[in-house]
Amino acid sequence: MKKTLFMLCLSFIAVLGAMGQTADADRIIGTYMTEGGKAKVVIDKKGDTYNGKLIWNMTEGLLDKNNPVKSEQTKPLVGKTILRGFKYAKKDTWDGGKIYDPENGKTYSCKITLKNNGDLTVRGFIGVSLLGRNTTWK
């Protein structure tokens, strides 16, 4: 009886911990304005990964002209997924994803950090995160 009660309590604690981690991980979900106010990106969750789609661009009708895939160059930037495959890593940090830069058509490894004020620090990099640059999304 004691063993059953102990296992039940242990299972309950594990479920509560997992629920708390999911709530923390989902804090990134929302709409953000990119640095300089050029575009808006909405981040959502699909399965266990977080992705971001461009939903507004300051220049209406802008096409993905720098995309290395020829067939994508005539498609509009609005509606394009530019953040892909992020997973919650630790407190206020999501990594393991990629960011597409429509200004040069390149895709980079990326890490996202949620600041206390709700802004995101988005760091795109090649190889290791030391070799990259930050941008702040509000």
Enumerate the predicted regions with their spans:
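Central antiparallel beta-sheet cores of small beta-barrel/beta-sandwich binding domains
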Residues: 29, 35-103, 107-109
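Structural recognition of beta-strand segments within beta-rich domains
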Residues: 33-34, 129
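Structural motif
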Residues: 46, 115-116
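Short polar/acidic secondary-structure junctions
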Residues: 102, 113, 126-128
